[in-house]
């Protein structure tokens, strides 16, 4: 596995700053789009997150973000076959070396305590083989305790909890748990492998892990049918990054989902980070569409202006002709036998009707022109 290069770190910094960190840290929700776009299995992503989050605060500073990104790239590009159980020395930041050592010590001590509980020496082989199974019943006192842990892990408005936040809260309460225990239990209570779960599966997640911690109970391989039916019910998600939200915002999810794609070339390919400013690209496209519509409206407005000018000229000519005909009638000294007065009146009435029709047509066109001007102004 090649070590970090300076150009990699610069590229990671561009991605990190583009995600708008708060106090130089990113939450799990901010990093979630990158994690999902990697197309890696949830269990792999969870393990990468745990390794990268050295200080266990459910956030990544830049050094931790570099660790997370590098391990994702190496898994995607198949530079490594699996996520290591511990960080390699060359990937550990100097400022966090002590924290890494402390974490290793805590895990090893927790494993030793668990082993001492499970492997109790006894003279009876039958007792050795016996392990207490998980009790699915939750008492009132236990439920109150679990709810307290659950509420401390809530990070979203719909009161659902993510794997990272809930696991961190459970670990702070029960220390004899391994990452494998947490991951296996999460998959058990989350059959649909959603990014977050509701209160009921969260309480059973805590309930199972408490018994694993206190009594070294083996994690069940399946749920009781009643619980499984409850946990697999479709939950309405309010998370904008979820698939349900794609129905409401197809432009964003379709045209911009490639901001972090799986590289096709061998080795660590950082070209996938290009195009992270997809919002700017989308706005530029919308601006180009608006400019096109504005240009079209202006052309229509110009054509209507030309048409109005022609209508004014025709009206003026007809009015002049009408005036000429009236003068002929008024100034004519010939007798009624020699002049067809009735025919002239018919001609005058016909011309007046035509002028009236043209005036109505002109009025209609002026109304259309006025509406077009309003549309043009609204586009600015």
UniProtKB/Swiss-Prot annotation:
Membrane as UniProt keyword: yes
Localization in the cell: Cell membrane; Endosome membrane; Cytoplasm, Cytoskeleton, Actin patch
A GO term from the CC aspect: plasma membrane
Bilayer topology: Peripheral membrane protein
Alphabetical list of Pfam families matching this protein: EH, End3
Major location category of this protein: membrane
Described purpose of this protein according to its UniProt entry: Component of the PAN1 actin cytoskeleton-regulatory complex required for the internalization of endosomes during actin-coupled endocytosis. The complex links the site of endocytosis to the cell membrane-associated actin cytoskeleton. Mediates uptake of external molecules and vacuolar degradation of plasma membrane proteins. Plays a role in the proper organization of the cell membrane-associated actin cytoskeleton and promotes its destabilization.
Protein name, entry field: Actin cytoskeleton-regulatory complex protein END3
Taxonomic lineage: Eukaryota, Fungi, Dikarya, Ascomycota, Saccharomycotina
């Amino acid at each position: 596995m090649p070590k970090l290069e300076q150009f990699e770190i610069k590229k990671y910094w561009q991605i990190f700053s583009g995600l708008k960190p708060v106090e130089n840290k990113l939450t799990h929700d901010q990093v979630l789009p990158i994690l999902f776009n990697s197309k890696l299995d949830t269990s792999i992503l969870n393990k990468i997150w745990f390794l990268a989050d050295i200080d266990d605060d459910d956030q990544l500073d830049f050094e931790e973000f570099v660790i997370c990104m590098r391990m994702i790239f190496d898994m995607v590009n198949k530079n490594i076959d699996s996520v290591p159980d511990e960080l390699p020395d060359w990937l550990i930041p100097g400022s966090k070396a002590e924290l890494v050592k402390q974490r290793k010590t805590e895990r090893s001590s927790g494993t030793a305590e668990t082993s001492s509980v499970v492997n109790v020496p006894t003279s009876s082989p039958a007792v050795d083989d016996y392990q207490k199974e998980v009790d699915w019943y939750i008492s009132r006192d236990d439920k109150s305790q679990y709810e307290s842990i659950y509420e401390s892990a809530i990070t979203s408005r719909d009161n659902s909890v993510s794997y990272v936040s809930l696991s961190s809260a459970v670990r702070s309460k029960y220390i004899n748990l391994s990452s494998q225990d947490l991951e296996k239990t999460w998959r058990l209570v989350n059959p649909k492998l959603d990014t977050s779960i509701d209160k009921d599966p969260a309480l059973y997640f805590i309930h199972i892990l408490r018994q694993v911690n206190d009594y070294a109970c083996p994690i069940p391989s399946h749920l009781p049918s009643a619980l499984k039916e409850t946990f697999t019910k479709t939950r309405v998600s309010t998370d904008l990054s979820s698939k349900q939200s794609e129905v409401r915002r197809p432009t964003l999810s379709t045209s911009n989902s490639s901001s972090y794609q799986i590289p096709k070339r061998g080795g660590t390919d950082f070209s996938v980070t290009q195009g992270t400013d997809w919002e700017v690209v989308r706005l530029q496209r919308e601006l180009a569409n608006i400019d096109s519509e504005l240009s079209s409206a202006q052309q229509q407005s110009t054509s209507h202006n030309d048409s109005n000018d022609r209508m004014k000229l025709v009206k003026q000519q007809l009015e002049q002709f009408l005036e000429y005909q009236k003068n002929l009638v008024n100034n004519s000294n010939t007798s009624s036998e020699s002049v067809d007065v009735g025919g002239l009146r018919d001609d005058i009435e016909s011309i007046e009707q035509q002028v009236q029709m043209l005036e109505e047509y002109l009025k209609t066109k002026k109304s259309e022109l006025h509406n077009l001007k309003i549309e043009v102004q609204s586009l600015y």
